[in-house]
Each structure stands twice: as structure tokens, then as C-alpha cells.
Amino acid sequence: MTLTVSRIFDSEKNKDRFDSCVILRLLLFVLIPNLITTPLRIFVEAVIEGKEGAPAFVTVPFIIYGICAELVVGLGYLVIGYKLPIKNTVLRGFAYIMLILISSYIPNILAMLGGDGKIIEESLSMGILVVDVISYSLKGLVLGLLMKNYDVKNPDEIEQITNTRFIICSIIYGALFAALNFLTDIAAGAINSSWRFCSILGVSTERENLFYIVFTIFMFMAGVLLPLWNRYCLPKKASISASIIFALEISLFVWLPNVLIMAFFGTPFMLTMAYGIAYVFMIMICVLVYRSSISLTNM
């Protein structure tokens, strides 16, 4: 992660993307949606869930994490989001946030549908889903408007592939990502049974099978959608080192903010961090396999 951030700020071709005006826009991107969605979250929870006051997870550390996560997501637009091939800069900013919504947030949150227990009950509710979807839409609109005049061209040539080839590579990516999740769970459970996904989330024994079926389906879905970033942002004929750096960027800006937040809903902090690190390696493997798949289909 340090290598990625250092490379971003040290590169001469990137310096014009991080002037004071851009940093100010990032701060506004963090501030404006949070000023609206935090009161909205309390209101929706009260109306839909019938709860009084703020939800239990809305604490000062949670708000601080949310601000830091949004800053990371905003930074991600300056690193990979601006590369999306959409001419209208407002729509480009909106599309960047929506792509995070469908490729990261939706699979992560819905992957818990098959489980039960207090942690899942707290983190997966109609109120949370409603507010989060509204929040993502608002963030996309705010980012697009703030970056309306930010039209930096992608310096890298992108691989042009047919839809058929892309679908095949995406299915391979999806199957591999789901399999890596499954194998990671088995490996963790072999060391200590309390390290399994179901144990960390407090899923009852009766719901374990259903939990893993649903979880695997949505991890496959995530694996099918994540290659959209590869298609539009991964440089053509990227080297292994460039592909690894790209995987680190996808992990940091797209995937991890929606994984690490679970620590605020009750998952053990160190185990949550450990799975976050594991996901970095999973995404790294998937990006390298995707790169190889594209190369093979070009032969």
C-alpha cells in the first residue's frame, strides 16, 4: 500500500492531478455527503426500523473511519476513476462511485443474507441498505459535480477486447475469486475454527450451509464485476509488477473500505484486518490470472 501511494504522488506525470484545488474538492466530497447522510441514517433507522436515536454502530470512531474511507475513495478517482471512458466528466465521477457500489458494496453486504446472528442483524437491515444506496448515489453526484472541470486524460493505452472475450475472462475471474474465498475460509478454519467467516460473523450452526451458499454466490458475483475495472483502467500489456500495483489500487480504493468497516459492527479487529490482507492477495491473484487470460485469448 505504501508503494502504491508513494508511486502516485512521486510520479511527475501525476503532480498536476493533485494540486490544492483538487485536494479541496476531495475534502468537499467527504464533507457534503456526510453532512446529509448522517442525519438521514438516524432518521431512516427510526422510520424503517423503529429505533430511537442513532444506530448503535454510529459512534465517533465509526464516523472517523467513514471520513477516512471516503477520502480514500475520493483519492481513488484521481488514481483510477478518471480513466473510465466516459466523456462527460460529471457522469464519469458518478459512474466511478456506482461501479464501486455494484462491484464491492452490493456483493459484500448481500453476501451475508444467508446468515443470522447479532452482527449480521446490525449490519444488514433495510434501513442501512436504503441509506447506503442513497449515500452512494449522492456521493456519485457530488463527486461528478466537483470534478466537472477535472478532465485529465488517461496516459495509458487500454486493451481493446470484445465483449465475448471479456465475459469469458470475467467468469474465470468470478469462479477464481469465489474459490479463493472458500479456500481461505478452509485454511483459516484449519488453524482455528473461530477464524472461519461464519464464526467471525456469529452465524448459528443451523444456518452455516445456507450462509456459505449465499456467500459464495455473491463472491462469484463480485468476481464477475471487478474485472470491469481491469477492462477500463488496467494498462495494455501491463507487466507483472504493474498488474500487482493495479491490484493494490483496486484493493485499497474499491474493496477494502467495505470489508474493514465490519469491525465496527462487532467482528474481531485483528481478524478483520487479517481478512483484509487476505483479500489483497486474492485480488492480486485474480488480476494476474485475468492478465494471463487476456494474453492467451490474443494468441
Q: What feature does the model see in each segment?
A:
Residues 2-299:
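Juxtamembrane/disordered regions of integral membrane proteins
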